[in-house]
Amino acid sequence: MIDQLSQLFEDPCVEMASIASTDLKEDDLNNDNVVKVNLDEENNAISFIRNNLNPESTYYRHIGIYAYRKNTLNLFTSLSQSDNEKNHRLEQLRALDNNIAIKLLISDFSHRSIDVKEDLKNYEN
């Protein structure tokens, strides 16, 4: 999957990339610990969200792996946190709020992350 992600940079317009999975379960839609992303027709992120989903939109499960061009990473790390990033606790919103497009690789990768204690309990059972 990392190799596929790096291939997105063959397009010189791609500055930042990440991965989205089609494996978004019904329970995930209402789980604030599962970050969802919706995309435009070219697989660029429109928004990342934890809750309050728009029923008219299609969402994917965001997999928190990022890739950057060096100059974009330098820019990103020099930017202050945006209000949007702070409010939603999603660092990728800093990029979108500063007009850094995020290209998404779509995968059917199925995974369960452990983000909170409840996830660990569910994993152990």
Give the positions of each predicted feature.
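Conserved alpha/beta core of the MobA/IspD/sugar-nucleotide pyrophosphorylase nucleotidyltransferase superfamily
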Residues: 59-125
